[in-house]
From Swiss-Prot:
Organism superkingdom: Eukaryota
Subunit structure, interactors included: Heterodimers with GPN1 or GPN3. Binds to RNA polymerase II (RNAPII).
Residue numbers binding GTP: G19, S20, G21, K22, T23, T24, S178, K179, M180, D181
MF terms in GO: GTP binding; GTPase activity
Pfam assignment, any one: ATP_bind_1
Native species: Sus scrofa (Pig)
Taxonomic lineage from the root: Eukaryota, Metazoa, Chordata, Craniata, Vertebrata
Protein name: GPN-loop GTPase 2
Length: 310
């Protein structure tokens, strides 16, 4: 952002596959932040997003419309969206002019849900990179639907997608398991919740997959994928129920720590509070245990016994 005298701005780039709850997250997080006294500006970067439930400070639809692109260039939804993001990348002066008057706000960027934008296409990464040069410190908040935990094969896929996104986007990163209140609506978890949030020994997942005749044929492939995930050892998740204020607060603490907002000058903080943010909350077993008791049905037998029966 222009001007040497301007202060650093902070925000979140909310990404994730379609249906993961990005727009709902932006609504809930913006309301929570305003309740804390922060000035919030929600920026819609998804040209396919219509009927937004939140007050939108900047809307990319004012620059380029997905339906217009599809009609004029004879593109499908995915191709049209990629073109829109490339068009935004080529017209970043428009975005900068929209964001400059909002200096002093905390930004929430509601991003498109096409996975390829966050795994290998360069437009969104280039946009984020340019924002950092405007002295806008972002944390990528990557949402995935928590019900994928109920299917070992899908969970491995989610881990691969999350890892690819972390490596491609090149921002401080927080992964969220969204819709925690619905986690067992599609099936029972094979392991305790902390197994999925901390991404513990994935060999247990391979054993679980081996019990399925279909996936037994792909054991070597799954072993290589698991080895790749564990070699990087980057992926972990924070559980989120956007209707639960305590859950939102845990997410916000992680985001503020990732982008440095907790050390900013906008709010007066004591040294004790700063040190607490710097060294605390990494070992959140107790909070994860509380979430398990809150959202998961109790198991009739310990996890170790369940694993031995696989």
């Amino acid at each position: 952002m222009a001007g040497a005298a301007q202060t650093t701005a902070f925000g979140q780039a909310v990404i994730g596959p379609p249906g993961s709850g990005k727009t709902t997250y932006c609504l809930g997080m913006s309301e929570f932040l305003r309740a804390l006294g922060r000035r919030v500006a929600v920026v819609n970067l998804d040209p396919a997003n219509e009927g937004l439930p939140y007050e939108c400070a900047v809307d990319v639809g004012e620059l380029v419309g997905l339906s217009d692109v599809m009609d004029e260039l004879q593109l499908g939804p995915n191709g049209g969206l990629l073109y829109c993001m490339e068009y935004l990348e080529a017209n970043l002066d428009w975005l900068r002019a929209k964001l400059d008057p909002l200096r002093g706000h905390y930004f929430l960027f509601d991003c498109p849900g096409q996975v390829e934008l966050c795994t290998h296409h360069g437009a969104l990464r280039s946009i984020f990179s340019q924002m950092t040069q405007w002295d806008l410190r972002l944390t990528a908040v990557h949402l995935v639907d928590s019900h994928y935990c109920t299917d070992p094969a899908k969970f491995i896929s989610v881990l691969c997608t999350s890892l690819a996104t972390m490596l491609h986007v090149e921002l401080p990163h927080v992964n969220l398991l969204s819709k925690m209140d619905l986690i067992e609506h599609y099936g029972k978890l094979a392991f305790n919740l902390d197994y999925y949030t901390e991404v513990l020994d994935l060999s247990y997942l391979l054993d679980h997959l081996a019990s399925d005749p279909f996936f037994r044929h792909y054991r070597q492939l799954n072993e290589k994928l698991v080895q790749l995930i564990e070699d990087y050892s980057l992926v972990s998740f924070i559980p989120l129920n956007i209707q639960d204020k305590e859950s939102i607060q845990r997410v916000l603490q992680a985001v503020d720590k990732a982008n440095g907002y907790c050390f900013g000058v906008q709010e007066q903080r004591s040294l004790e509070a700063m040190m607490s943010a710097a060294v605390g909350a990494d070992f959140h077993f107790s909070s994860t245990l509380g979430l398990q008791e809150k959202y998961l049905a109790p198991s009739d037998q310990p996890v170790e016994q369940e694993a031995m029966q696989l």
